[in-house]
Structure formats: structure tokens, C-alpha cells
Design a protein with these regions (language model features):
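Feature responds to low-complexity, polar/acidic, surface-exposed segments characteristic
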Residues: 18-61, 68-91, 95-125, 133, ...
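Bacterial N-terminal signal peptides
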Residues: 7-16
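Bacterial N-terminal signal peptides that target proteins for export
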Residues: 1-5
Length: 141
């Protein structure tokens, strides 16, 4: 649980801001906050995405997260850093990071606790179920 505290801090700081009347949290901001919570280790900012300049905010975090397998692109060698992060993406990023930390991310119960599972993209369903089950995300109606 100790290693999950930075992730809980991340969610406490970022996700309420996204739900309020403030600008939504971008994909780059979310990944940068995750990287900072993980210790903000120095990392080569030269990542694989054509829309993330080496000196842009979040470039180091995005390259770090990509190399760990936490993030992937949005297609066409792009990351789309300025697009708001979706709850599906947030859940996916968090689950992949938890797996990187060696946490159990298996969820045998699946959609039982989810009330809008028919609206979830198939690529994100397990991650959303997991993030909800472990208390990282709340399910909304």
C-alpha cells in the first residue's frame, strides 16, 4: 500500500480539478503528476511521439511512462498531450503503473460493481473495474 500512496495523492489532486469548473487535466499533466509522485527521476525526454517536443512540459514524464509501458500513443506516432485525459485512460495508466510496481491488478469480479459497464470501451473495462475495486476511482451514475 505504501507504494500506492503517491497514486492516491495524484488522484486527490488532479481528478477533482477535472470535475470542477476548472480546465480539464490533460494527458500530459496526468502523466507528469504520476511521474512526479513516482519520484520524478531524471529521464531522457526523447520519446517516440511526434507531437511531444523534447523540451515541452511533460516530455520527460511521457518518455518515462512510455518506456515503462504505462502509456501508449493515440495513433499515428502521436500522444496527443494536450487532450483531456479520460477516466478510461486514467484507469489504464494507473493499472499499468501498479502492475509495474508489482501490484496484483487481477480483478475476478469484473463489472459487478459498475453501473455503466455498457458504456466503457472494451480496451479499458478491466482497468476501470480494477481502479474502482481498489478505491482509486469512484463510479458515477
Amino acid at each position: 500500500m505504501r507504494q500506492m500512496i503517491p497514486v492516491l495523492l495524484l488522484l486527490t489532486l488532479l481528478l477533482p480539478a477535472a470535475a470542477a469548473a476548472q480546465p480539464p487535466v490533460t494527458r500530459a499533466q496526468f502523466v507528469a503528476a504520476l511521474w512526479a509522485c513516482a519520484g520524478g527521476v531524471p529521464y531522457d525526454a526523447n520519446g517516440p511521439f511526434s507531437d511531444v517536443e523534447r523540451d515541452s512540459p511533460g516530455a520527460t514524464a511521457i518518455a518515462w511512462a512510455y518506456d515503462l509501458g504505462v502509456v501508449q500513443g493515440t495513433g499515428g506516432a502521436c500522444f496527443t498531450p494536450d487532450r483531456p485525459v479520460t477516466r478510461e485512460e486514467a484507469a489504464m495508466f494507473l493499472r499499468r503503473y501498479a502492475a509495474h510496481l508489482g501490484r496484483d491488478t487481477f480483478l475476478p469480479g469484473g463489472a459487478a460493481a459498475c453501473n455503466d459497464f455498457e458504456d466503457i470501451s472494451p480496451w479499458a473495462d478491466d482497468s476501470l473495474y480494477w481502479a474502482t475495486a481498489v478505491g482509486l476511482l469512484e463510479w458515477s451514475e
